[in-house]
Amino acid sequence: MEFSAQQIAGFLNGTIEGDPNVKVSNFSKIEEGKPGTLTFLANLKYAHHIYNTEASIVLVNNDFKPEQPIRATLVKVENAYAALAMLLNLVEQSKSKKKGVDSTAFIAASATVSDDCYVGNFAYIGEGVKMGKNCMVYPHAYIGDHVTVGDNCVFYPHATVYENCIIGNNCILHAGSVVGADGFGFAPEGETYKKIPQLGNVIIEDDVEIGANTTIDRAVMDSTIIHRGVKLDNLVQIAHNVEVGENTVMAAQVGIAGSVKVGKHCMFGGQVGLAGHIHVADHVVFGAQAGVISDVKEATTLLGAPAINAKNFMRSSAIFNRLPDIYRSLGQMQREIEQLKKEINKQ
């Protein structure tokens, strides 16, 4: 597909600086731009590339002011990154989608699957499954008995949904993700551990995306709940009975222990860990590798392990880096004090 700068600006409600008739048919990074491609500048850290890029069109924020001439045509918008996402979604939606059921797929007789869905080779859809419209189940995906799936969902290869779980509308489960496996529940019995049956389920609300090899465990009796708009990166672990609030995002290798309640609009950097049974307020930000062992009662940014307020962490880090010098100074002070004591004792 090919679009002119004029068409793109019209779609994005943007303005043009340059040739409105220049056309593009692909995307590129700003530092690797080629003629016929569109790129963007959202982070001014990369602003120096805009003067050398060979891309034909660059999306920029309305407040961007060039410091020297630019060869590319600029399309100015309110938010360049959000505008790029809109264009990428437009291209994605224009792609033809597979439909129908491949010959080696299995769909149980009691399952209800809309005629406009795609079910790939060796995919499995169990008894009593109810699947909405326009879903895509790629080869080797598994949807267990009595699972309910909304409209416009995508299950990539080897995505697994255990029995009785509920998936909302517009959800994406990437390859190897597992929804509804048993929670890590064992009762000590002498020197061994006895398994506690996990009889609950997982509820995934609308517009949730689950990354590759991410796991969300079923609850003991009720539901593990991932609320609307949550985005989980690859290799995230959500334990049983957890509740994750709306529009919270988690980067790779985050681990949430059992019965944690996470608020709305929280942000988790990579490898953050939360201890079990704690509550997190709305709008909390966790820096990478933060270790959280107690409730977070108000919106804040936390760093470190155990996690503390970001400003205090930065001050502590600055002091930590100076510890060798402080240690040497302290040693010198101690020696001087001892010398003074000796001189005083002589008097």
UniProtKB/Swiss-Prot annotation:
InterPro entries: Hexapep (IPR001451), LpxD (IPR007691), Trimer_LpxA-like_sf (IPR011004), UDP_GlcNAc_AcTrfase_non-rep (IPR020573)
Active site location: H240 (proton acceptor)
Catalyzed chemical reaction(s): a UDP-3-O-[(3R)-3-hydroxyacyl]-alpha-D-glucosamine + a (3R)-hydroxyacyl-[ACP] = a UDP-2-N,3-O-bis[(3R)-3-hydroxyacyl]-alpha-D-glucosamine + holo-[ACP] + H(+)
Keyword presence, Acyltransferase: yes
Keywords: Acyltransferase, Lipid A biosynthesis, Lipid biosynthesis, Lipid metabolism, Repeat, Transferase
GO biological process, one term: lipid A biosynthetic process
EC number(s) recorded for this UniProt protein: 2.3.1.191
GO cellular component terms, semicolon-separated: membrane
Class in the EC hierarchy, top level: transferase
Pathway where this protein functions: Bacterial outer membrane biogenesis; LPS lipid A biosynthesis
Superkingdom of the organism of origin: Bacteria
Family of this protein: Belongs to the transferase hexapeptide repeat family. LpxD subfamily.
Subunit structure: Homotrimer.
Function per UniProt: Catalyzes the N-acylation of UDP-3-O-acylglucosamine using 3-hydroxyacyl-ACP as the acyl donor. Is involved in the biosynthesis of lipid A, a phosphorylated glycolipid that anchors the lipopolysaccharide to the outer membrane of the cell.
Name this polypeptide is given: UDP-3-O-acylglucosamine N-acyltransferase
Native source organism of the sequence: Parabacteroides distasonis (strain ATCC 8503 / DSM 20701 / CIP 104284 / JCM 5825 / NCTC 11152)
Origin organism lineage: Bacteria, Pseudomonadati, Bacteroidota, Bacteroidia, Bacteroidales
